[in-house]
């Protein structure tokens, strides 16, 4: 009962934090009847809010399938509490009978609601008290949402039926049994609709105090670029595995022939979006120290990385999903870093970043740990004692594993670990000279109320103003989930440019903007001076690997890795392996027992089956024109 009260307390705080966005959080008890929905501006606005209500709660790790269905996080097994259904996908439990995290029915319902709104709002005899400008903007918002829901379906299922208009209620039964449309047609439809929507939208919301979360032109064009990148990626562009994937009438659903023009179109779209974002005042976030206390350059860099995700409505956010709450994500990620409050049972650390992610981050020289010719990571569990010079990243004079030393700033910004420093706003001295840290071997304060299974923590997702106390209370600053931020768009552009034209100064430019904020040298400097493969960045395949790594590192814990591994068509290589971490049963007086690589699970990814979701058997039985995805 106590824990339920704590959760309610957090939810109350979340509501306060998002009071300015209450419009997007107001969903009518029932979808308004058409008799009343378009009689006035206020009623039409409620219907528009219903269009928004089908956006996913991306900040909830139990809802956002990208958090638990891949290899980025792992949970303790069995899970005593909480929603971990999506984790069953990672454990091989997907099914055609009742597909886990299926969105087929929900998103098509959202599309139908958007269609109804668009059909009625276009009739100028309705909603007579609505201004022309507002009618235009609302039309653009609903058009985008309709396109976005199609994108979510495409991303998950591949070829899908396009529902451009609602069928009349008396439509013949045969007309309702729609078939799936080819992926190229789906991608072009979504991209064109988003482009049309963008022409009706403004660069910025008119009133930030009430309108944040509304769709704007930068959102529409940035998501259009992402859609086109997905359509150009190997899963859907030149994938021979789908050469025989056809509708019952023989129509090919995924073209097995590679088409480079798709990458060129994606690159053009990304550049257009970048230019619009610039004109809208969207730029890379940099932390400004307003604490009144000195902070080292090392901590300042880490705070720029952390707050790019967690600072509400910061200047890098293109689309912040204010329909979501991140309290569950933060609660599940926060470590017991304050020894005075180690007994706080309201903290429930469950999300454990895997060794796949830990090893993914670069060295301090900006190259993969396997490529750095100046640093030896052959024995990642070897014990090493942190020095005074390393005190802003690791606990001085404390032993930790080799893998936790000499890493890039994003490693220390994104991950909490045994022996690591964890700066927060309420740090004891308010400086980073005397700040919180994490000691989480058995018998230490960090493990008082349990560890994550891997003993790593996703520090990045926890807002630096999170506070918890000895009396089991906490203060949590919620933030809109960053569905799209500028770094994401820059990476999409760099990827598309390399795939379309090969290595160029333009690709390096946008990669290096991100690397500069991350506190590492340029691509050229890092590979020339530190890599065992100094010319890697000069070839298209080599630069592709660098772009992939850069994306995994920059977008860690934001729900990108799960989908990127699939669209790059490398999930079968990455997700057929062991889930590894340290031994959480290792004790404080025996660090060797803690730093023992432990396998928790062996994943089995079956290609091509697991690249796409299965359609539910029930849907196939109702509509015989639908065909199942290959392998299911």
Predicted feature locations:
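Short coil/linker segments at helix-helix boundaries
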Residues: 160-180, 235-265
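Short coil/turn linking the two alpha-helices of tandem helical-hairpin repeats
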Residues: 154-155, 159-161, 227-239, 499-502
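Long, intrinsically disordered, low-complexity segments
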Residues: 19-20, 107-110, 189-191, 267, ...
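Flexible, polar/acidic helix-loop-strand segments at domain edges
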Residues: 336, 355-356, 362-371, 375-485
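Conserved, well-structured interaction surfaces
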Residues: 45-61, 79-157, 173-217, 381, ...
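Extended amphipathic alpha-helical segments enriched in small hydrophobics
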Residues: 146-147, 224-228, 480-521
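Acidic, glycine-rich segments characteristic of secretory precursors and extracytoplasmic regions
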Residues: 20-70, 116, 123, 133-139, ...
